């Protein structure tokens, strides 16, 4: 039942510090609205200790597709709807930056970046469960050992997706997949949703840059620093 899965997700969000207890009712109502429900689950929700929200999200995504909230046959729409769900359980950009700066000032930069990385995992922006399915091996070459990885978080496009992309009118927003206007973007068939995406401002040589983690993790704690202006 969708309402029960919503309660499971709220429990996960609370235990992982995504949603404060004071914000739980607001988050619950936002999720109920997203799924077209008028009331929450009335029973007790069993206590769980989940590392990742994948199982809950899969159940909610299956239910959302059945309700016609998105085309379940198109993987990109499924991934985009997942970001929409988790975006309702995240602190806003300003709150993320405030927490990051507070941790950096009180406990140092490692504590701040560790918190930010965990936030990206807990919100499934970094798709850790899928990354664990990556196929990886080493092979010897004349230049030394080469590590090869087949990244399972970026599946090949299916024929329906390719056909829909051809019908999609060109859009110049966001300018690229790294620009800061990606924060909270709903996505489209040829552009990933970023409602569960946050960035941290950093100053380098007196200029404004931003720090983010890569959702695909080509190497451990793969991060990206980009300029405030698209260049």
Identify the meaning behind each predicted range:
Residues 1-230:
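Active-site microenvironments that recognize anionic phosphate/pyrophosphate groups
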């Amino acid at each position: 039942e969708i309402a029960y899965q919503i309660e499971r997700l709220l429990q996960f969000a609370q235990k992982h510090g995504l949603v404060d207890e004071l914000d739980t009712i607001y988050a619950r109502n936002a999720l109920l609205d997203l799924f077209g429900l008028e009331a929450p689950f009335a029973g007790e929700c069993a206590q769980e200790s989940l590392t990742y929200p994948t199982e809950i999200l899969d159940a909610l995504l299956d239910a959302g597709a059945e309700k016609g909230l998105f085309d379940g046959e198109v993987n990109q729409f499924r991934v985009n709807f997942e970001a929409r769900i988790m975006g309702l359980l995240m602190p806003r950009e300003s709150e993320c930056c405030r927490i990051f700066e507070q941790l950096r000032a009180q406990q140092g930069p490692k504590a701040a970046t560790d918190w930010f990385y965990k936030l990206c995992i807990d919100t499934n922006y970094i798709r850790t469960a899928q990354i664990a399915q990556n196929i990886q091996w080493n092979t010897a070459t004349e230049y030394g050992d080469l590590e090869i990885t087949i990244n399972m978080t970026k599946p090949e496009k299916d024929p329906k997706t390719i056909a829909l992309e051809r019908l999609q009118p060109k859009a110049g927003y966001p300018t690229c997949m790294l620009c800061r206007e990606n924060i909270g973007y709903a996505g489209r068939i040829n552009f990933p949703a970023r409602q569960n995406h946050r960035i941290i401002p950093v100053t380098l040589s007196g200029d404004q840059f931003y720090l983010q983690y890569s959702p695909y993790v080509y190497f451990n704690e793969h991060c990206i620093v980009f300029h405030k202006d698209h260049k």
